[in-house]
């Protein structure tokens, strides 16, 4: 009879606690930098069962998953699956997870601010960066409503004046 493994409800994966009751691809997708498609590719390349729960995996399988991404490469997958293609400094394709991804993104934003590119200026001003509309959305602070044109304001004041003078009854 084989040794019965105990089910792990919380699994430590890439320095992050992941729910062990989830199926392996969905649990891997909970890690920052790994989406569902990337998780499926990892599970397929490692030969794991995609229908098993993460808590059912042995410690060796979990180590195998972590070691698969330690060199920042996913072996035998197309380049378009990487989340950092053609790195600015090294020029190589990488796949980053957790704190590495956060670090690289923060450095990219700081570099853009330093060279004062359009994106860097937008980041430093706290405005939208990717060309979204800013006239009506993304307002911060106490700005509420829309400013009316002078013609519309004059027409509204005239209507108020007519309503107030015409609505009063004269007593005599």
Curated annotation (Swiss-Prot):
GO molecular function, one term: rRNA binding
Official protein name in the record: Small ribosomal subunit protein uS13
GO BP terms: translation
Alphabetical keyword list: Ribonucleoprotein, Ribosomal protein, RNA-binding, rRNA-binding
Family: Belongs to the universal ribosomal protein uS13 family.
Quaternary organization: Part of the 30S ribosomal subunit. Forms a loose heterodimer with protein S19. Forms two bridges to the 50S subunit in the 70S ribosome.
Function: Located at the top of the head of the 30S subunit, it contacts several helices of the 16S rRNA. In the 70S ribosome it contacts the 23S rRNA (bridge B1a) and protein L5 of the 50S subunit (bridge B1b), connecting the 2 subunits; these bridges are implicated in subunit movement.
Bias (Low complexity): 134-163
Sequence segments annotated as region (Disordered): 131-172
Highest rank taxon of the organism: Archaea
GO cellular component, one term: cytosol
Organism the protein comes from: Sulfurisphaera tokodaii (strain DSM 16993 / JCM 10545 / NBRC 100140 / 7)
Pfam families: Ribosomal_S13
